[in-house]
Amino acid sequence: MSFLDSLFGKRQRSSDIARDRLLTVLVHDRVKLTPDMMEQLKAELSTVIARYVPSVDAGAIEVTLMRGEAVDHLKADIPLRRTSQKL
């Protein structure tokens, strides 16, 4: 690994990117979640979580499906806005 690779990271090959995209499509197909259903899931997650955690950044929620070795995973990345209050 050269110094520049360690500094900037190694770029993914287009074949790796295409493989990841294909796996994502296959997982979505297997789980039967359409893009509209994913958007609805995001909206409902933000509504429910905002009831308990008011600092949820609803516009930045990301929901992804990932293929695991034994099971598929639904991952929700829910960022919170920082508040000026100290704990």
Swiss-Prot record:
GO terms (BP aspect): cell division; regulation of division septum assembly
Signal peptide (UniProt feature, chain positions): none
Alphabetized UniProt keyword annotations: Cell cycle, Cell division
Matching InterPro entries: MinE, MinE_sf
Organism domain of life: Bacteria
Disulfide cross-links: none
Pfam families on file: MinE (PF03776)
UniProt similarity note: Belongs to the MinE family.
Physiological role: Prevents the cell division inhibition by proteins MinC and MinD at internal division sites while permitting inhibition at polar sites. This ensures cell division at the proper site by restricting the formation of a division septum at the midpoint of the long axis of the cell.
Name of the molecule in the record: Cell division topological specificity factor
Organism: Roseiflexus castenholzii (strain DSM 13941 / HLO8)
Lineage: Bacteria, Bacillati, Chloroflexota, Chloroflexia, Chloroflexales
